């Protein structure tokens, strides 16, 4: 519990010490943000209780993970072209005038707001305020116009695994450091980080987590996580750029973007 408390404190300090600036484009695609006078990235905890598997076979996936537990996939696809297209400069040039639909970052995401993609990136894409509620925080994820974004999505190579009777559907998103979606559940799928880092917290369907649906994941991490007994802790891990997390059907999960993050999920509906 002491380690969890230190993690939360470090996260809060790094997120909210000084003024945010966007670093020049590099290996982070121009998305990386920092704060003057602080470390360049949000601290992460080393704890990881989700298996990482490189070059997993379909047989192994079906036998050990598909209906049983999450797994982090490495080395299954090459999305270097898609990643290059997702740089800040390229996305603004290609889709800056497109109207995107933002959702509130709470469990039920009731509120929707439409505005130009460039306005979202330049004015709303900033680190999460720890005092803000999830239902007051706007977040670009999920509601994609597949016709308008098809020139981008056609270059994405999803993990090659499918479940019988399901059809894949993409959900593309970009969010600021410290943002995320609190605990919720839905059908199975994969979530790949293109730029940045995203921390996941997961519970099996039969174990409902303690959380407030309108509070942010950051608030949960600072207020509830440190007091959890070891037996009550979720499975958790930080997904790095180029990795994809598989989550089985109806698993509870919450996410926390440790950097400004670009990500895409493949839902198996």
UniProtKB/Swiss-Prot annotation:
<dbReference type="GO" id="GO:0043123">
    <property type="term" value="P:positive regulation of canonical NF-kappaB signal transduction"/>
</dbReference>
<dbReference type="Pfam" id="PF13621">
    <property type="entry name" value="Cupin_8"/>
</dbReference>
<dbReference type="GO" id="GO:0005634">
    <property type="term" value="C:nucleus"/>
</dbReference>
<feature type="signal peptide">
    <location>
        <begin position="1"/>
        <end position="24"/>
    </location>
</feature>
<dbReference type="GO" id="GO:0005737">
    <property type="term" value="C:cytoplasm"/>
</dbReference>
<dbReference type="InterPro" id="IPR003347">
    <property type="entry name" value="JmjC_dom"/>
</dbReference>
<feature type="glycosylation site" description="N-linked (GlcNAc...) asparagine">
    <location>
        <position position="135"/>
    </location>
</feature>
<feature type="glycosylation site" description="N-linked (GlcNAc...) asparagine">
    <location>
        <position position="145"/>
    </location>
</feature>
<dbReference type="InterPro" id="IPR050910">
    <property type="entry name" value="JMJD6_ArgDemeth/LysHydrox"/>
</dbReference>
<comment type="function">
    <text>Functions as a positive regulator of TNF-induced NF-kappaB signaling. Regulates angiogenesis and cellular metabolism through interaction with PKM.</text>
</comment>
<dbReference type="GO" id="GO:0006110">
    <property type="term" value="P:regulation of glycolytic process"/>
</dbReference>
<dbReference type="GO" id="GO:0005783">
    <property type="term" value="C:endoplasmic reticulum"/>
</dbReference>
<keyword id="KW-0963">Cytoplasm</keyword>
<dbReference type="GO" id="GO:0000987">
    <property type="term" value="F:cis-regulatory region sequence-specific DNA binding"/>
</dbReference>
<dbReference type="InterPro" id="IPR041667">
    <property type="entry name" value="Cupin_8"/>
</dbReference>
<keyword id="KW-0325">Glycoprotein</keyword>
<dbReference type="GO" id="GO:1903672">
    <property type="term" value="P:positive regulation of sprouting angiogenesis"/>
</dbReference>
<keyword id="KW-0732">Signal</keyword>
<protein>
    <recommendedName>
        <fullName>JmjC domain-containing protein 8</fullName>
    </recommendedName>
</protein>
<dbReference type="GO" id="GO:1903302">
    <property type="term" value="P:regulation of pyruvate kinase activity"/>
</dbReference>
<keyword id="KW-0256">Endoplasmic reticulum</keyword>
<comment type="subunit">
    <text>Oligomer. Dimer. Interacts with PKM; regulates angiogenesis and metabolism.</text>
</comment>
<feature type="glycosylation site" description="N-linked (GlcNAc...) asparagine">
    <location>
        <position position="214"/>
    </location>
</feature>
<feature type="domain" description="JmjC">
    <location>
        <begin position="147"/>
        <end position="269"/>
    </location>
</feature>
<dbReference type="GO" id="GO:0005788">
    <property type="term" value="C:endoplasmic reticulum lumen"/>
</dbReference>
């Amino acid at each position: 519990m002491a380690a969890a408390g230190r993690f939360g404190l470090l996260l809060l300090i790094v997120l909210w010490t000084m003024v945010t600036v966007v670093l020049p484009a590099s290996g982070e695609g121009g998305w990386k943000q920092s704060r003057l006078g602080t470390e360049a990235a949000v601290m992460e905890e080393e704890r990881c209780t989700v298996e990482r598997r490189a070059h997993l076979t379909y047989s192994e996936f079906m036998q050990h993970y598909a209906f049983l537990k999450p797994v982090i996939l490495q080395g299954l696809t090459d999305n270097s072209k898609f990643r290059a297209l997702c740089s800040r400069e390229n996305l603004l040039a290609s889709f800056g005038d497109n109207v995107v639909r933002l959702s509130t970052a709470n469990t039920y995401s009731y509120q929707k707001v439409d505005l130009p993609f460039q306005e979202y990136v330049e004015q709303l894409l900033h680190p999460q305020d720890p005092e803000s509620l999830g239902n007051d925080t706007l977040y670009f994820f999920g509601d994609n116009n597949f016709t308008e974004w098809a020139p981008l999505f056609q270059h994405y190579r999803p993990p090659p695994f499918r479940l019988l009777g399901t059809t894949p559907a993409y959900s593309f998103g970009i969010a600021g450091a410290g943002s995320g979606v609190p605990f919720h559940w839905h059908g199975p799928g994969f979530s790949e980080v293109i730029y940045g880092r995203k921390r996941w917290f997961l519970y099996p369907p039969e174990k409902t987590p303690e959380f407030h649906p309108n509070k942010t994941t950051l608030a949960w991490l600072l207020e509830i996580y440190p007091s959890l007994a070891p037996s009550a802790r979720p499975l958790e891990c930080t997904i790095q750029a180029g990795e994809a997390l598989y989550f089985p059907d109806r698993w509870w999960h919450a996410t926390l973007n440790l950097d400004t993050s670009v990500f895409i999920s493949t839902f198996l509906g």
